Amino acid sequence: LKKYFLLFVLACASFMAKAQSGFNYYEWGVGFGASYGRGFDDLNRQVWHPGGGLNLTYNYSPYVPMSLEFQFGTLEGGGRTPDKDQFGRYSKNNYKALVLHADLQLGEIIDYDNSGFLNVIKNFYGGAGIGAISNSMKDIQRTNLYLFNGPDTYVFPGKSKSVNLMVPLRFGYEFKIYDDYDQVGYTITLGYQHSYTFGEGLDGYNDNTQKFKNNAPDQFAMFTIGFKYNFGNTVSYTKLVRNFR
C-alpha cells in the first residue's frame, strides 16, 4: 500500500510540475552589453564611439525587468579647424554613468495566448530611468583659436570634470532563450537609448547663449546590444511565458 501511495504522490508531483511548465521565470539576472553612441550638445559635429555596460536586474515579472546599470563610453565633438567648428572648440569626454531603469514589454499588458503574431511582438519594450553621469574631458580646447572670432585670450567657460543628473528613454526588443526547465535562462536585447542630462557637462562647454547656440540640455544617444543570464528563485507568472506551438 505504501508503494502505491508513493507512486501516486510522485505522479501528482510530476503532473503539477508539468502543468507549471512555461509559466515560471527567474527572479534575478546579470548581464553585459555593447553600445555605439554620440552626443547631442553644443558642438554641431559629433563622432560616434563604442561603449559598454554591466547590469544587475530584478525581474518583477518576465516582462518588467528593473536594472541597475553601469555604463561607460566616449563622447567626442567639434574640431580645431573651422570646417569642424567655427570657433575651434573640441572636446572628448570619457564618461561613466550609473543608471536605474525599468522596462515594460508588451507581454505584460496584452493577451498573446492564442496568437503567433502577438507572441512575437510581446517582447517589444519601452522604458525610462534616472541616474548620474560623470564627465571627464580627456581633451578639450579652452581658448579661441581664430582671431576673426575675437581675441585669443578668450577662454570658453565650462568644467572639465562634472557630474550631471540624467534621464534615459529606452526602446527595443528582447529575444528570450529558454532552458531545460522551460524558463527564460538567457536574453539577447537590441535597443536604442536616448538620454537627457540636467547640466552642461557632456561637452565641457557652458557658453554664453547670446553668442553661441546653447538652447537645449545636453543629450546623448546610443544603439545597444545586450546579453543577460537569469538566475535565482523561480517565480510563477499568471500567463504562459513560453509558447509551445
Kindly label every feature range from the protein language model.
Residues 19-59, 228:
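Short glycine/proline- and aromatic-enriched beta-strand/turn motifs that initiate or cap beta-hairpins
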Residues 20-27, 63, 108-122, 177-186, ...:
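Short loop/turn motifs that connect adjacent beta-strands in outer-membrane beta-barrel proteins
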Residues 32-36, 54-58, 100-104, 128-132, ...:
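Residues on the lipid-exposed face of transmembrane beta-strands in outer-membrane beta-barrel proteins
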Residues 37-39, 73-77, 107, 131-137, ...:
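Structural signature of outer-membrane beta-barrel domains
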Residues 38-42, 83-95, 114, 152-159, ...:
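Extracellular loop and loop/strand-boundary signature of outer-membrane beta-barrel proteins
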Residues 64-150:
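Gram-negative (and chloroplast) outer-membrane scaffold detector with strong preference
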Residues 176-245:
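Predominantly the C-terminal beta-signal and adjacent terminal strand-loop region
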